[in-house]
């Protein structure tokens, strides 16, 4: 009976022995922990640099071109005189007055560009 008990104890001892590669920190891969966080940051930095280049190479010239086109359109619009206003029955209908000011002006009224019924244009266009 003693011979049967010995092999069982040896196998139990072998199964309970911890296979260790060294100290506590070495077995938990602390060195690789930092690298696992730094590697995606390096990749993100490369992607952000790519998008910065795309912005400076594509977006800024497009913005400049759009600003130039808007400036030219504004100059063309301001170069000719304002046409005579034609009063149509369906324009500037006032069934009841607006609840602000004198009731005859819209909320975002532009004196130089919007016609007021009964008054006309309140100001001339500025030349600039």
UniProtKB/Swiss-Prot annotation:
Superkingdom of the organism of origin: Eukaryota
Mitochondrial matrix side: 20-53
Database matches in Pfam families: COX6A
Gene Ontology molecular functions: enzyme regulator activity; oxidoreductase activity
Mitochondrial intermembrane side: 72-128
Membrane topology: Single-pass membrane protein
Database matches in InterPro entries: Cyt_c_oxidase_su6a (IPR001349), Cyt_c_oxidase_su6a_CS (IPR018507), Cyt_c_oxidase_su6a_sf (IPR036418)
Pathway annotation from the record: Energy metabolism; oxidative phosphorylation
The keyword Metal-binding is assigned to this record: no
SUPFAM superfamilies: Mitochondrial cytochrome c oxidase subunit VIa (SSF81411)
Single Gene Ontology BP annotation: mitochondrial electron transport, cytochrome c to oxygen
Compartments, as annotated in UniProt: Mitochondrion inner membrane
Keyword list, A-Z: Membrane, Mitochondrion, Mitochondrion inner membrane, Oxidoreductase, Transit peptide, Transmembrane, Transmembrane helix
Keyword Membrane attributed: yes
GO cellular component: mitochondrial inner membrane; mitochondrion; respiratory chain complex IV
Membrane-spanning parts: 54-71
PANTHER family to which the protein is assigned, alphabetical: CYTOCHROME C OXIDASE POLYPEPTIDE VIA (PTHR11504), CYTOCHROME C OXIDASE SUBUNIT (PTHR11504:SF0)
Family that this chain belongs to: Belongs to the cytochrome c oxidase subunit 6A family.
Role, per record: Component of the cytochrome c oxidase, the last enzyme in the mitochondrial electron transport chain which drives oxidative phosphorylation. The respiratory chain contains 3 multisubunit complexes succinate dehydrogenase (complex II, CII), ubiquinol-cytochrome c oxidoreductase (cytochrome b-c1 complex, complex III, CIII) and cytochrome c oxidase (complex IV, CIV), that cooperate to transfer electrons derived from NADH and succinate to molecular oxygen, creating an electrochemical gradient over the inner membrane that drives transmembrane transport and the ATP synthase.
Quaternary structure annotation from Swiss-Prot or TrEMBL: Component of the cytochrome c oxidase (complex IV, CIV), a multisubunit enzyme composed of a catalytic core of 3 subunits and several supernumerary subunits. The complex exists as a monomer or a dimer and forms supercomplexes (SCs) in the inner mitochondrial membrane with ubiquinol-cytochrome c oxidoreductase (cytochrome b-c1 complex, complex III, CIII).
Protein name: Cytochrome c oxidase subunit 6A, mitochondrial
Naturally occurring in which organism (per UniProt): Caenorhabditis elegans
Species lineage: Eukaryota, Metazoa, Ecdysozoa, Nematoda, Chromadorea
